[in-house]
Amino acid sequence: YRIASSSIAKMKTAVFLVGLLFLGLVFADEAAIDSEFDQSIDKRGCIATGSFCTLSKGCCTKNCGWNFKCNPPNQK
């Protein structure tokens, strides 16, 4: 009886550790995506307005001001 209860405790511990590992991987992945997104933002205009940049040209949306990275520059 004691052996069975201790093995159940070990299983619970293992499941808990695997769950923690899984959560860690999910959060690490989201952090990586966030940092990549930050790099695609025009530092002068996009952060101030909180708007997204298009990934294709690295241009700001019309909510942002002029973006020197656009070709041609986005002046909407």
Curated annotation (Swiss-Prot):
GO molecular function, one term: sodium channel regulator activity
UniProt KW Secreted keyword: yes
Record's keyword terms, sorted: Cleavage on pair of basic residues, Disulfide bond, Hydroxylation, Ion channel impairing toxin, Knottin, Neurotoxin, Secreted, Signal, Toxin, Voltage-gated sodium channel impairing toxin
Role according to the record: Potent toxin, demonstrating strong inhibitory effects on insect sodium channels (Nav) and reduced activity on mammalian sodium channels. Potently inhibits inactivation of insect sodium channels of B.germanica (BgNav1) (EC(50)=8.6 nM), D.melanogaster (Dm Nav1), and arachnid sodium channel V.destructor (VdNav1).
Record remark on domains: The presence of a 'disulfide through disulfide knot' structurally defines this protein as a knottin.
Signal peptide: 1-28
Coiled coil spans: none
Protein's name according to its UniProt entry: Nemertide alpha-1
UniProt site (Hydrophobic/aromatic residue important for potent activity): 52
Organism in which the protein naturally occurs: Lineus longissimus (Bootlace worm)
Propeptide: 29-44
Additional remark text: Negative results: does not show effect on both human and rat Nav1.8/SCN10A.
Family listed: Belongs to the nemertide family.
Organism domain of life: Eukaryota
Subcellular location: Secreted
In-chain residues carrying the UniProt-annotated modification 4-hydroxyproline: 72-73
